[in-house]
Each structure stands twice: as structure tokens, then as C-alpha cells.
Amino acid sequence: MTDICTRVAHNLRVAMAHADIKTAEDLSAASGVSVYSIRNYLAKASTPSLESLAALGLALGCTPNDLMGWNTDEAA
């Protein structure tokens, strides 16, 4: 789980920078995901649910796959 938490935290920070969203509060306002949850994701304390990934991706202009670090170009 730690590797997933680390990957999500990193990808979330990168996506926030690309979207020019500077704080967890700003991302919360844009996504509807609680500030508490976003802070936990950034602190590598938990991973987002599918619903949260979708909302965060929509707010950040990316996909849940981008946030999870899943490469959709690779063959299964």
C-alpha cells in the first residue's frame, strides 16, 4: 500500500502544479473532495476511492489512471 500511496501523492502534486492549483483547499473547492481527504492523499496516509479519483481527475484535467500512475498504453 505504501508504494501506491507514494505514487498517488506524487502524481497528485504533479497534476496540481500543471493545473495551477496550489493548496488542498483550492483542490477541494474545485473537486468536491474534502480537504481532510486530500491532505491524507498528499501525506501518503490513504488512497482515494474511485469516486474521489474521478472528481480529482475532473478538477485537475487528468484521468484516474494518471493519478494512480497506471500506463494504459501497456498490454495487459
Predicted regions and their residues:
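Short alpha-helical DNA-recognition segment
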Residues: 20-40
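Residue-level detection of the helix-turn-helix DNA-binding "recognition helix"
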Residues: 17, 43, 72
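A short, Lys/Arg-rich alpha-helix, primarily the initiator
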Residues: 1-25
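Short, charged recognition helix plus adjacent turn
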Residues: 2, 40, 58, 68-76
